[in-house]
Amino acid sequence: MAHSLYITGTEGSSGKTVVTLGLMHFLQSQVRKVAFFRPIIDSEDEARRDSSINLILKHFELDMLYRDTYACTYKEALELVTSGNMSLLIEKIFQKYKALENEYDFVLCQGTDFRDKDTA
């Protein structure tokens, strides 16, 4: 069995969270320690917490801190990319993922959609 899976969609609102719920349910019946990870979230603002992270942490009662479930915000990622530091962004995401991989038996990753973001 693999030790991680990355769920992504071809567009926003494609059902990633529903797939994530089903996979997390299955994984918890098969694997002792499962982590949830999103590489990039919209905001770190307490009032605007990521709804997928909140849902997964609460529904499956994961023993994880919220701050351990993501690598950076959209704003941080955009700043790194526009300043020519894409490699730093990739390194930051990879380091956060590897920390989870070292602590958990399986890491379920859910991609991010930026349907409401200006990507031009």
Which residues does each PLM region occupy?
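Generic structural motif recognizing short loop/turn segments at the entrances and edges of beta-strands
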Residues: 1-3, 105
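N-terminal phosphate/diphosphate-binding loop that engages ATP/GTP or pyrophosphate donors
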Residues: 3-14, 18-99
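Phosphate/Mg2+-binding loops and adjacent switch elements
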Residues: 88-120
